[in-house]
Amino acid sequence: MSLERELRQLSKAKTKAQRSGQLREEASVCHQLGELLASHGCYAEALREHQQELQLLETTDDPLGCAVAHRKIGERLAEMEDYSAALQHQHRYLELACALSNHVEQQRAWATIGRTHLDIYDHHQSQDALQQAQDAFEKSLAILDEKLQGSLPKRELSEMRTRIYLNLGLTCESLQQVALCSAYFKKSIFLAEQNHLYEDLFRARYNLGAIHWRRGQHSQAMRCLEGARECARVLKQAFLESECCLLLSQVLLDLGDFLAAKRALKKAYRLGSQKPLQKASVCRTLKYVLAVVQLQQRLEESEESDPEVAMGICEQLGDLFSKAGDFPKAAAAYQKQLRFAELLSRPGPELAVIHVSLAATLGDMKDHRQAVHHYEAELKLQEGNPLEEAKTWLNIALSREEAGDAYEVLALCFQKALGCAQLAGQPQLQRQILQHLHAVQLRLQPQEAPSTETRLQELKAAGDEDEGDGEDEEDEEDDDALEATELELSESENEADASPPLEEDEELRGCLGRQRVNKWSRRNDVGETLLHRACIEGQLGRVQDLVRQGHPLNPRDYCGWTPLHEACNYGHLDIVRFLLDHGAAVDDPGGQGCDGITPLHDALNCGHFEVAELLIERGASVTLRTRKGHNPLETLQQWVKLYGKDLDSETQEKAAAMGRLLQAASLGRAPHSSQAPQTLPSNHLFDPETSPPSSPCPGTPEVCEASTRVSQGLAVSTVARPRRSRHKVASSSSSEGEDSAGPSQPTQKRPRHASPSLQTKAPMPGPASDREAATTSTSWAAYREAIRGVGSAQTCRLGPSPLRGPSEIPIPQAALIPQEECLAGDWLEEDFPMSPGHRGRCPARPQSSGDGGRHRASGPGSDTARRPRAQARQSRLPYLESWSTPVRADRANSQATEPARSPDVPRVVAPTGENPTTGHLPGQVLPPPIRVRVRVQDNLFLIPVPHREAHSVAWLAEQAAQRHYQASGLLPRLSLQKEGALLAPQDPIPDVLQSNEEVLAEVTSWDLPPLRDRYRRACQTLEQGEHQQVLQAVEHQGSAPTFSACSLALRQAQLTPLLRALKLHSALRELRLAGNRLGDGCVAELLATLDTVPGLTLLDLSSNHLGPEGLRQLAAGLLGQTTLQNLEELDLSMNPLGDGCGQALASILRACPVLCTLHLQACGFGPGFFLSHQVALGSAFQDTKCLKTLSLSYNGLGPTALGPVLGSLPAHSLLRLELSSVVTGKSDVGLTDPVVHYLSQEGCVLEHLSLSANHLGDKDVRALSRCLPLCPSLVSLDLSANPEVSSAGLEELLSTLQKRPQGLSFLGLSGCAVQGPLGLDLWDKVVAQLQELQLCTRRLSAEDRNALHQLLPSQLGPKVCTLDQGPKLFFRHL
């Protein structure tokens, strides 16, 4: 029904109620009208209806109705952004609800108030509003828990709780409380799913997706938004789905996936929007994306065939990206254009234009140094063209100005630009150059500005020329570039009118461009295949059809999830059973973005206990851990802990039963289905997306439909579960910090051997002896012993046969696995070790195995085990054609059967004799050396694996740890992963890795002995002698939160082992290194240490020979990091920093958000320090909301620079300011003017001011005195070492203090020309107005001392402390 029709009907009903005098009925219609109008954005009209509703209900004396009307009026006012009036009505609503003792309305009132405060924060960024919002939501939740539990229907309670959790999650996100935010969102999503509250579920998933996007967690954001989009479809709200598509397109644009972004934007465009601005935004963005896609496709086609065309396309792409504000992509496009141009040997002017584009783009990216580099390259190419040289020199000057270079460098560039412009005869350009130069001179060199202004006046006669044609033309060209996409956009509109294509085809269309690919490789925006989608949607028939048609079983989406993961996540039991029957990887830990979550973890994390039980029956490991270190039992315990309060008794019983099952399984007592085949992953030589699917071994019986259950309590689990961020479901259980920024390559775990009780009875070819039958009944331990020496076609394992203890009886092993122990989908090769005294050979018979792509060599059984032989390993072979004939070996050699190899793969035969320590035998061919690349954090190590003895993954991890220690001084404990799959420490390296492969080492913990031992070990590693004083310091301060190594004059070589020893010293809060020789060369080591001690609150680097280059290194290392997030005090005093370090200092200030104290004494700052970097430093100081103490003493800033410095300081928070000796001589007059201006401004809270040694006189003290009443917070003033200040200045100061409500707690006048006798009256004022006075002058008389001693006992008695010795006369109130 249209809005107009609904409004007409309600208006008629309202008129009818008015005529009949039914006030309550009329109020009800007003309420409906208000809600309808508000839902369509007509807030003012809705407000009038609710106000009329309130008047009618007040007439009828309906307090509850009035309360609800106040709530609605408040909501409408909040939507109109009149928050103060909204809060008045909402608090009135709360008062009425309290008066009625209506807890339901009280709960709603607090929730509504909290929502309004959250809106206030969104508009005004008020932290107070945020805190009030949190308080209101918590009160609402408390009422729900304490008053309403059990008094309302469960669904209504869940709906209330869902919305409160969502609002609390949003509030915690704004408060940057990440853990609480995640927990609240998980609870909200869990309850919304459990109770099918799709509107609330949409809000939770959409908001969580936006949060993930803002945090840069693109993979999780995409899945949350797809989940929200699914809710919008269920609700049949096209506008909501359009919003999801629009935000999803922004995520995809961040990832650089323009094709996927185009599809999302087209959907948003077709679905439409309520908001005209949003519709225009969709249209504009879609035009841009279509243009980019078109250009990228053309570039791909012409890149190799026609470099000249490709060069032009790169330029168009760069221009397009630049206009859209995506400067990194623009710079990459221009760089590519430059490479093509150099390849084609284009003339200099053409190359120069590209350098200009690059320089301008880098300038937009604030990389001004690199921009200067490209301008200089352009200058060389434009040599001989004075006009272009002039423009380039101007650009160089402007870029250097942005980079913060000194005035001398800038002036030289401007002069060269001016000279070239004069040579080219361009008065307008000369004028432009002089205008820029004049602005720079006013800022940095005011004395030179008048002459430049005179030259400008002389050029004015040249007149103004039209300056805009070029820009207009450029805009027109850009518009033309975008207009070319109108055709495709109109096509998308026509699609909306025509019959829409199938959703599945729309989702999976064209992700790989025009390239023809395997039909099973088609994917949607998040990398999901047809099988993924069928598993998510619970379409068992569709899953069966796809698998029977040959769809791969274990493909991964871009995040790394397999179809089995999705089926377990959604709780589709029949689909899980079917996938397991056909060989799905039961213990797949997912890809890089999956946190090591196996299907069993997934099912438990979502509360699907029946699915979890089935997985355990099929041999799922109950000991595998996620990257966070949780095994399945711990995952279940976490799930119960998070949702325990919201679970009913039945679900709690099911969770307890599942816990008992997991405990029993971990002890080896779990029941297993004897009829369910355990099909393991197919050969990992094959790409799981393109290889043939696995099928059961021939003769494998079908799985029985009714399988054994642990208990009846686990038969059904309908509890809605928390979701991980994935397509069609909101993020809840995945790690907040894990992303998959792009498509991860499909990976597959090595085959995992399961218990014999889980295996299928499959007939095996070849005879089986009685001894084989006896082996069938052996225990699991015996089975593991039997397969310990097993090799595979992918391994090249060297080593002796397994050793048995003296009491163990050798169990003769058969050549074939007995039928009842068959590993469906896996196989054992003919490579058992052979006992001494037996030799022979068994003919190999190719036998098709269950995976459809591997072959098994089997033969008659033997009573003796055979030695393993090594084979070359080759990854991702398209197929294995055949097996070669067995190799006959002599007494020392075992027999070996090897696959045929391509000529470039070396054939390896490694004989194994009786004694593993014997040397190589004649005729032995050594295998090629294995080198493995191991990435540990930011370091990549190439580690050789010697063949002389078998090395395990644990050995490789130890080697990598030692190399990391040598490089960084930290010894980690590592676990190794390959393509997201954890490598077991005991596995031999050749079994799981091949040469030149890269593995990722994850740090599980750090080896951190006591600080003294770490220091000694670091000295040994660096071959540096131990410094005895440092050794004493680390012994005495090893466990203290403060570490000090001050005034030891340690050189860089001596500081390096100390800094390495302090890494990961978690107790460290204060680090004092004053009085050493850190210099610029040791800054990298300091940064590496600071990065590992995030709890540091104080850093003292004073007097350390730290120069401007070292400070720049420190700033660059802190950029974008959270290293000094908790730093409260920083001391850089007495370092030769100079005027050129302003930009670096500004970056450091931004990297320390809670900095309270900053010491910059005697750093060699002059007037140019602040004036050269006024914008950067001013902005940085203004943003230091917590700064309370600043010391700039002993820097020759002068009065000229002091004014801008004080103008940029945060007067509302700064409490202590030290400006001692900031003038260079008596000629620097006017220092007090900027100080007086600072003290007189409104909101100044300064408490202590130091102006000692600044050549001040009585006139300056008089000026300071006049502003004291305007700054009542100032209670401490240091004017010492100013010999021009006399008794007159003191008297003027004391007279002014009488006009204030309080005097001063401290006044320092040591070294001033105060001359006695001062008189009893003046001393009386001193005692009355000052809590502490410090006088140190030889001009005081005996009368002054007597007067002070006479006054103090009479007025203060014993509550005073005095010092009267020589020229010193101090007193202090106690």
Curated annotation (Swiss-Prot):
Residue ranges of coiled coil: none
Modified residues (Phosphoserine): 711
UniProt feature, compositional bias: Low complexity: 731-744
Residues where Omega-N-methylarginine is found: 788
Key words of the record: ANK repeat, Chromatin regulator, Chromosome, Cytoplasm, DNA damage, DNA repair, Leucine-rich repeat, Methylation, Nucleus, Phosphoprotein, Repeat, TPR repeat
SUPFAM superfamilies registered for this protein in UniProt: Ankyrin repeat, RNI-like, TPR-like
Feature: compositional bias, Pro residues: 690-699
Superkingdom of source: Eukaryota
Positions of the UniProt region annotated as Disordered: 460-508, 668-777, 829-908
Swiss-Prot/TrEMBL TPR repeat ranges: 27-60, 67-100, 107-140, 162-195, 202-235, 242-275, 311-344, 352-385
GO (cellular component) term, any one: nuclear replication fork
Location within or outside the cell: Nucleus; Chromosome; Cytoplasm
A Pfam match: Ank_2
Biased composition (Acidic residues): 464-507
ANK-type repeats, residues: 526-558, 559-591, 595-627
Ranges: LRR repeats: 1065-1089, 1093-1121, 1124-1147, 1184-1207, 1243-1266, 1271-1296, 1327-1350
Keyword Nucleus on entry: yes
Comp. bias intervals (Polar residues): 672-682
MF GO annotations: histone binding; histone reader activity
Family designation: Belongs to the Tonsoku family.
Task performed by this protein: Component of the MMS22L-TONSL complex, a complex that promotes homologous recombination-mediated repair of double-strand breaks (DSBs) at stalled or collapsed replication forks. The MMS22L-TONSL complex is required to maintain genome integrity during DNA replication. It mediates the assembly of RAD51 filaments on single-stranded DNA (ssDNA): the MMS22L-TONSL complex is recruited to DSBs following histone replacement by histone chaperones and eviction of the replication protein A complex (RPA/RP-A) from DSBs.
Domain comment (free text): The ANK repeats mediate the interaction with the MCM complex and histones, while the LRR repeats mediate the interaction with MMS22L.
PANTHER family linked to this entry: TONSOKU-LIKE PROTEIN (PTHR46358:SF1)
Assembly information from the UniProt record: Component of the MMS22L-TONSL complex, a complex at least composed of MMS22L and TONSL/NFKBIL2. Interacts with the MCM complex, the FACT complex and the RPA complex. Interacts with MCM5; the interaction is direct. Binds histones, with a strong preference for histone H3.1 (histones H3.1 and H3-4/H3.1t). Interacts (via ANK repeats) with histone H4; specifically binds histone H4 lacking methylation at 'Lys-20' (H4K20me0). May interact with DNAJC9; the interaction seems to be histone-dependent.
Protein name from the UniProt record: Tonsoku-like protein
Organism, scientific name: Bos taurus (Bovine)
Lineage, highest ranks first: Eukaryota, Metazoa, Chordata, Craniata, Vertebrata
GN (gene name): TONSL
